[in-house]
Every structure is written in structure tokens, then in C-alpha cells.
Amino acid sequence: MPITPQDRLSRRQVLMASAALAAGALPRVACAQERRFDPQPGVWRTFEVTTRVEIKDASDATRVWLPIPSIDTDYQKSLENTWTGNASSARIVADSKYGAKMLYGEFDAGATPPVLTLTSRVQTQNRATDWQRTVGATEDAATLKRWTRPTDLMPTDGIVLDTAREATRGAWSDEAKVRQIYDWIVSHTYREPEVRGCGVGDIKTMLETGNFGGKCGDINGLFVGLCRAVGIPARDIYGIRLVPSAFGYRELGGNPAKLQGAQHCRAEVWLKQRGWVAMDPADVGKVMRLESAEWIKDERNPLVVPVKRALFGGWEGNWMAFNNAHDVKLPEARGAKLGFLMYPQAENANGRYDALDPDNFKYTISAREILA
């Protein structure tokens, strides 16, 4: 059949449409390849963080504990705390083992609902490690020993030790062991959105059941536990995200007007030639699970690669640390110890309030950046 001019036109239109589709796809590929996540230290930011707790039931005497930033390091300066409310007494207290500070308020039984508002001012900055340069790091031997010990939820023997040995097989230096544990965590664990709060951090149960889904308290807790099991000092740092990420990652920032649920724990390890080094494999899993519409299961994805690279040795300073305490016994409390302290806590004669139940335990957290 002869080709008509109309046929030629239709063919050209098809070719032009195909070219347009190909051209339209290029920016998306380039955009994915150009995603950047590279926090670098050097600029300090100042934040004012306000936590307000209101207890609806005023019929019993009530006790309230609000975590206070207790960290002073090369990445955070905890400056000052002020508070208001109708407590019969309020004061700053600390747990006896780790020194985690908190505002403690006592409220008498009465008709007025207990209210306590805490305002904390901090300065933060990004963290990053120059892996091409070693430093003359020193730390007290007793301090390092402390950060290799087990906790109630973080044993370092049995299945935890066996898993750590398997994950570090063939690695001889502390840095190589930490790298292999980090990679093992990223490849074996995953973010599970249905887990309440930041998770429990029961790492033995995770390994025994083979259920590696969790949140930061579980995943970074497992990372820390595996490091400790092979003799590498490591610790969780419990805190809260304050503002959006400067790199456009939605899941790696917080809404400063409403920070309930923005609590997040990170981790540190002690490397002989580096000192204390930042780590956050849990946030790699969070990006893989939640940053895009579909669950990313390949850590080589262009959205994931820069995050995985940067969070081995660094983190973004849009986050405030509270403390690094485990097995926290709240001063003056009648209830059980907490695995960690990131959320406001309260109790009355009926027991401990559920900090994740907004209907009965109402609190708000907000942040404001103070610009010079």
C-alpha cells in the first residue's frame, strides 16, 4: 500500500511525541540523581522549644516530668530553661545514673486541671566526619567502659553477641566493624509505621522473633546493642526534630508549629581514631519506607544513597538532643522504669498516663528559630 502524506504526518507526530516523552523523562532522572543530603558543621542555629502539658483529670494529686535538653557537646549547647504553670511545686531534677534532666512538677488534687509549660533554649549545628583525616581522640576509660555495658532492653550476650559477630565477620578495625554493622542494620531492618511512638527498643526480642520492623528506638537501639556486643562504645541520643530538613527530605524534618510525634533518637559510636561519631541508620530506613509514595527496597536508589552515606558519620542539626539515658527511673515516681525518656510523662494515684494517648494526656511541643 502506498504511503500518503497523511501517513507521513502521522508518523512524524508519533516520533515527535516519543521525543517529547523522552525529553520529559530526562529531568526526572536528573533530579533523582541530583538529590543532595550533605550536612556540614560550621553554622550554629538557636532554637526556643516550648512544651506544654495539660492533664484533664484534676481529681487526684498528679506528678509530671518533662524532658530537658541535657547535652553540651560540639554539636549542641543547652542554654537555659524557664517554666510556668499552676504546679504546687516545680523544679529541675535528674536521673541518678545518666544525669538526664527533666522538669518535675507536683499538682495537688483540685478542680483546676494541671498545666505545666517548659521553654528551653538551645543551639545546634550539623555533624559530619572527615574520613580522610584521623584525630587524636581521647576519652576517659571508665566512660568508654560504661557505653559497652548492657541495659535492660539491650543485652550484649546470647543472640545479640552471635548476631554482632556474624555482622562483623572479617572486620578487624573498630571502624570496619561499625561500617558492617551499619550496613547490616540498613539491609535487615525496616521502618514499620504501625509501631507506636519511637518503638520499645527490645533488641533481644527483635532478633529472637526475626521481626526487624520498628522505629528509631528499635532500629538505632539494635545498632547500638550490636556495637556494644563486640566491644565498641556506643550510645543512643534521645531527642526531637525541630524544623524541616534543609535538603528537602520531608521525613527528615519536623513541623515547628506541631512537634508532637517528632521525637527521634540517634546514635553515636566511639572510634579510636575519630572520637565520638554520629550515626543514624534508622533514618535511612525511614527514607526508604516513607519519603516516596512507594516503599523503596533498594538502598542504591538515588533518593537513598546520599542519606545512607551522610548518616554514617553525620546528621543534620535540625534536631535537639534531650539525653542519652537508658532504664530511666523518674525521680519521685511510683511507676516502673522507662526504657528511655523522650516524651512528657505523668502519673497519679491510678498509675502512669500513656504518653501516646492524646485524649487523656494532652501535650503540645513547638519550636521557634531565633535569628540574629
Language model features by range: what are they?
Residues 1-9, 20-23, 29, 33:
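N-terminal secretory signal peptides
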Residues 244, 248-372:
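Active-site rim recognition segments
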